[in-house]
């Protein structure tokens, strides 16, 4: 199904009916509204003006459209900020943020939590029983604009309580944090401050706990809203729209309270922000990198326990990246079908009409500001027509699992030990290598069952808890661990037995030294898989095992014991591809050597091919394949769908 984000409050009421009619005629079924409308719903304290929203919902419902109603807590109104200025967050430099944008509140503020409770309750009581309202989106893009981590007095107070609940005694905290170092010992929890504005870097254990606390505060704020919506809107779904390449909060944890996950897909903006080689950025400037959207579809399908929506789909140029090119003709259609191929239940475009005013006036919509349809509209309408003629099969478990850990991202943010070290970069390297082989991937959290997967990839898991170790033990196929796995304890210390810590129960080896390498400084590793120049990161391993790859100094780069492999270096794309191809072959999976820019995804018995390149390519379909969309020749920025005989 397809949907759209709509802002009736931005347009004259006389236009609403025509907009709703055109939405229906375009094949759209769902419309998200209301997520930034608090000041219009409550222009003054206690004076509620529901009439316009009542009318907007009724107008959409009259055309058979289903409404996704956003709770308006991402934008507290000016009168609320003036009455309670303490709700404004404080940045890491100690500066109080101001009114005039969005997301201007602190998750720990008791006052703001009560105000959020009040407005969400009123909203749910009024609209929770309406047939036209299919469900609710809580808030909007938690953490956008660097807002997960606040440094206000309320956060400090709440953090102290969080620490006491976690450690019980200040002696236990001192032991966990290693506060004997630099004379950091605390006599009570009341002495612990937030980890910022220190002369030298803060204690890494302190920082990690603060990041955990901040993520927990977002989850608590979201849960407050979910509980209200469950009570007053039974039978309605509750979701939240997460962001791309964003790790400040643990989406796996937060989504436990949701019916499914949603995310906002902007492939061109994300590609422009990625640390890609310049030539690759140029190659995919108008399409997005072929694995950007797919990675997030697979991630948020995992976050949503098998269910996800794209709540905002890029329809044209955006306004927030360093450069904002227009999508190549056909890409809006391709992105939409790609989301559906990965299991999206709804793809909703942002937005119906480009705003002529304010901060996002340069952000394209399905229509121009003068209401004329734009590129995205025509491509969305085509998808709707194609969808009407097809019944998508269910999504099956992928053959490969990739273990993704938000806590790992926090640990490497706290202690990268190398300027180029990026957890997301390493994850993306492995994910992209799998996709280039034509393999489908499920992204799962640590501790998720790995049964049924041909093999699993763990790009890096610094803290290995018992539930994760048990899942690795029960895995039926090979498990590949990347560098720095098992390198930290839960309190951010080096394991007494040395890394990989608990993984030594699976792999008899010790990492005794590590180094980060500046760009251009390479170590060569070679073995049965080939010869590979490697950079960025290298580890020295002691093990009673014969390495599968060896550095030129004779030290091992890749080890294996039974089903388990450990890679003691940052892999090159070539090494990742060769190693993953070997594991796939061992597991009996068919791998392909796909042309540059071509990617596949299977959904049931259907195979989807997406061509991100400027040249036509041949679809890797069998002779007897039955094409449902397109043909064996997949044109530039086009797709094909077929069913194998």
Swiss-Prot record:
CDD domains: A4_beta-galactosidase_middle_domain. Keywords: Glycosidase, Hydrolase, Metal-binding, Zinc. Optimum temperature is 70 degrees Celsius. It retains more than 75% of activity after incubation at 85 degrees Celsius and the half-life at 90 degrees Celsius is 1 hour. Thermostable. The keyword Transferase does not apply. Inhibited by Cu(2+) and Fe(2+), and moderately activated by divalent cations such as Co(2+), Mn(2+) and Zn(2+). Considerably activated by dithiothreitol, beta-mercaptoethanol and cysteine. It catalyses: Hydrolysis of terminal non-reducing beta-D-galactose residues in beta-D-galactosides. GO terms for cellular component: beta-galactosidase complex. Its EC number is 3.2.1.23. Transmembrane segments: none annotated. Gene3D superfamilies: 3.40.50.880, Glycosidases (3.20.20.80), Golgi alpha-mannosidase II (2.60.40.1180). It comes from the Bacteria. The active site is at residues 141, 312. Coiled coil: none annotated. Belongs to the glycosyl hydrolase 42 family. The trimeric structure is essential to exhibit high enzymatic activity. Homotrimer. This is Beta-galactosidase. It comes from Thermus thermophilus.
């Amino acid at each position: 199904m397809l949907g759209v984000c709509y802002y009736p409050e931005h347009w004259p009421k006389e236009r609403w009916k025509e907009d709703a009619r055109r939405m229906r005629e375009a094949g759209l079924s769902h419309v998200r509204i209301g997520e930034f409308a608090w000041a219009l719903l409550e222009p003054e304290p206690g004076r509620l003006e529901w009439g316009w929203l009542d009318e907007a919902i009724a107008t959409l419902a009259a055309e058979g459209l289903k409404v996704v109603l956003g709770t308006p807590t991402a934008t507290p109104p000016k009168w609320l900020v003036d009455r309670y200025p303490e709700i404004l967050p404080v940045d890491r430099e100690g500066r109080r943020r101001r009114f005039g944008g969005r997301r201007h509140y602190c998750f720990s503020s008791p006052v703001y939590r009560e105000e959020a409770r009040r407005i969400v309750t009123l909203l749910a009581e009024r609209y929770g029983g309406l047939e036209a309202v299919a469900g609710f989106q809580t808030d909007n893009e938690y953490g956008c604009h660097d807002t997960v981590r606040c440094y206000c007095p309320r956060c400090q107070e709440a953090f102290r309580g969080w620490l006491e609940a976690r450690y019980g005694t200040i002696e236990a905290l001192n032991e966990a944090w290693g506060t004997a170092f630099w004379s950091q010992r605390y006599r009570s929890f009341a002495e612990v401050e937030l980890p910022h504005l220190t002369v030298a870097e803060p204690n890494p254990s302190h920082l990690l706990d603060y990041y955990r606390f901040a993520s927990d505060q977002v989850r608590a704020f979201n849960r407050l809203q979910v509980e209200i919506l469950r009570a007053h809107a039974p039978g309605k779904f509750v979701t939240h729209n997460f962001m791309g390449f964003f790790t400040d909060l643990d989406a796996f944890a937060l989504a436990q309270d949701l019916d499914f996950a949603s995310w906002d897909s902007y492939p061109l903006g994300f590609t422009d922000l990625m640390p890609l080689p310049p030539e690759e950025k140029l190659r995919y400037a108008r399409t997005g990198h072929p694995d950007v959207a797919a990675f997030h579809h697979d991630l948020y399908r995992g976050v949503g326990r098998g269910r996800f929506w794209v709540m905002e789909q890029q329809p044209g140029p955006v306004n927030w990246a360093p450069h904002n090119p227009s999508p190549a003709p056909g890409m809006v259609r391709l992105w939409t079908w790609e989301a559906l191929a990965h299991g999206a239940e709804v793809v909703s475009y942002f937005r119906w009409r480009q705003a002529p005013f304010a901060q996002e006036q340069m952000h394209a919509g399905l229509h121009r500001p003068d209401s004329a349809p734009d590129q995205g509209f025509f491509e969305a309408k085509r998808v709707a027509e194609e969808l009407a003629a097809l019944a998508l099969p269910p999504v099956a478990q992928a053959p490969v699992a990739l273990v993704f850990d938000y806590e790992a991202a926090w640990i490497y943010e706290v202690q990268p030990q190398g300027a180029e070290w990026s957890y997301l970069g390493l994850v993306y390297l492995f994910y992209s290598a799998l996709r280039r082989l034509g393999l489908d991937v499920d992204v799962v959290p640590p501790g998720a069952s790995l049964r049924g997967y041909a093999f699993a990839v763990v790009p890096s898991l610094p803290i290995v808890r018992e539930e994760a170790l048990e899942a690795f033990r029960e895995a039926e196929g090979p498990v590949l661990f990347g560098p720095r796995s098992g390198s930290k304890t839960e309190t951010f210390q080096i394991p007494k037995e040395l890394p990989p810590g608990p993984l030594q129960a699976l792999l008899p080896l010790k990492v005794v030294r590590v180094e980060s390498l500046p760009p251009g400084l390479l170590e060569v590793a070679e073995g049965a898989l080939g010869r590979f120049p490697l950079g960025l990161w290298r580890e020295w391993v002691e093990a009673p095992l014969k390495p599968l790859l060896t550095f030129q100094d004779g030290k091992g780069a890749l080890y294996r014991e039974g089903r388990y492999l450990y890679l003691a270096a940052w892999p090159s794309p070539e090494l990742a591809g060769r190693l993953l191809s070997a594991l796939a072959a061992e597991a009996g999976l068919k791998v392909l050597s796909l042309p540059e820019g071509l990617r596949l995804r299977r959904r049931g018995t259907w195979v989807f091919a997406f061509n991100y390149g400027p040249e036509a390519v041949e679809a890797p379909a069998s002779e007897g394949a039955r094409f449902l969309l397109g043909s064996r020749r997949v044109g530039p920025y086009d797709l094909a769908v077929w069913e194998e005989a």
